Regions:
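Short helix-loop-beta connector
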Residues: 132-139, 161, 218
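Rossmann-fold NAD(P) dinucleotide-binding segment
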Residues: 199, 207-227
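N-terminal ligand-binding/catalytic initiation module
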Residues: 1-118, 126, 298-301, 308, ...
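Glycine-rich Rossmann-fold phosphate-binding loop(s) that bind the pyrophosphate
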Residues: 144-145
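NAD(P)-binding Rossmann-fold cofactor-contacting core
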Residues: 158-179
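Adenosine-phosphate binding glycine-rich loop
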Residues: 14-16, 234-329
């Protein structure tokens, strides 16, 4: 822990240095947090959305969280999504995390978090592949932004055998970049061909369904529904529908939320990823599987706390000794 009243500021460069090469560690960390959440050892309230009437696609989201398992950590992630940033050469998302002392509530760390957010999203998706599917024979990727690239990287870290990667994106420049980065097994394909792979990754900024309503996935397929709003409700109606957290995901007009509204019930829910990790549920092999992770703030906090502990040992970061001023009363 930082000295009493001190604030540790950790910038993007330190975050990147910490995350590099730690794919296996992060996947296992995410599994541990999912287990803690399933056991009731977390507090993960609803996300809070700040929206702008004149620019409805833009939003800033607050994700407060608390974990009480091997380590005790509380805090909040504040993450923005401004899709039009990409038209100006900027990343769509930016984020920070504040960690708070669970004894007195005082904040002790302020951390650049867009990279943490991408890494924990990718680690969660890779864990779902490991638990729900196993090694893919082909990977279809819809979207080629940072989340798609990071998730593909984490999935590939699980397995030594290279498989075809088929990528579809409306942005030709971005998709060319990801194809170049991931080597000769990557190719640019149509949406239909990408959706035909046995492992499908949806990572776009779509706000409403655009995949044709007629699309139906096959029993051998796992769909990582990262962006949550690409598919029509009918497409997932008969699938094995797996979530990180049911209550979190069934809101904000995600595809599962739309299906709940159409059905008037939640009978389409198969379970949470933690239930499969703990061998409490089984997939129906006669149906495809769709994993829809809303994204839990507890994952961000776990990664941020591990990073904080690493930086404390290394002595890096910017320390503000009297950040809170006179704390006595």
């Amino acid at each position: 822990m930082t000295k009493y009243g001190e604030m540790l500021i950790i910038d993007a460069k330190l975050v990147e240095t910490f995350l590099k090469g730690r794919e296996s560690f992060l996947i296992d960390l995410v599994e541990r947090v999912y287990r803690a959440h399933h056991a009731g050892n977390t507090v993960c309230p609803d996300s809070y959305f700040l929206r702008f009437p004149d620019t409805p696609r833009d939003r800033i989201i607050a994700l407060p969280s608390y974990i009480n398992d091997q380590t005790c950590v509380s805090g909040i992630k504040w993450i923005s999504s401004f899709p039009e940033n990409v038209d100006h050469g900027l990343q769509r998302a930016s984020a920070v995390i504040v960690l708070n002392n669970t004894d007195n509530g005082y904040a002790y760390a302020f951390i650049e978090a867009s990279r943490i957010s991408a890494a924990r999203t990718a680690a969660s998706a890779a864990l779902a592949v490991r638990v729900l599917h196993g090694a893919p024979t082909s990977i279809g990727v819809v979207g080629s932004g940072p989340i798609a690239q990071k998730t593909l990287h984490f999935i590939k870290s699980l397995y030594t055998t290279a498989v075809p990667v088929k990528i579809h994106d409306l942005n030709g420049e971005l998709v060319a970049r990801i194809v170049t980065r991931h080597g000769p097994e990557c190719s640019v394909v149509s949406l239909e061909e990408a959706l035909g792979c046995d492992l499908v990754l949806l990572a776009t900024s779509a706000g409403t369904p655009y995949v044709p309503m007629s699309v139906r996935f096959q029993p051998n397929q796992l769909v990582l529904n990262i962006s949550l709003r690409d598919l029509h409700p009918e497409t997932i109606r008969t699938a094995n529908n797996v979530f990180d957290d049911v209550e979190h995901c069934l809101k904000a007009n995600t595809t599962p939320h739309l299906l709940e509204q159409l059905n008037g019930n939640r009978n389409f829910i198969t379970g949470t990823l933690a239930e499969f990790i703990c061998s409490e549920k089984q997939l129906d092999p006669d149906h495809p599987t769709v994993f829809s992770p809303f994204g839990l703030g507890i994952l961000d906090l776990a990664v941020a706390q591990s990073l904080y502990e690493h930086v404390q040992i290394s002595g890096d970061g910017l320390r503000v000794p009297d950040f809170h001023g006179d704390m006595k009363r």
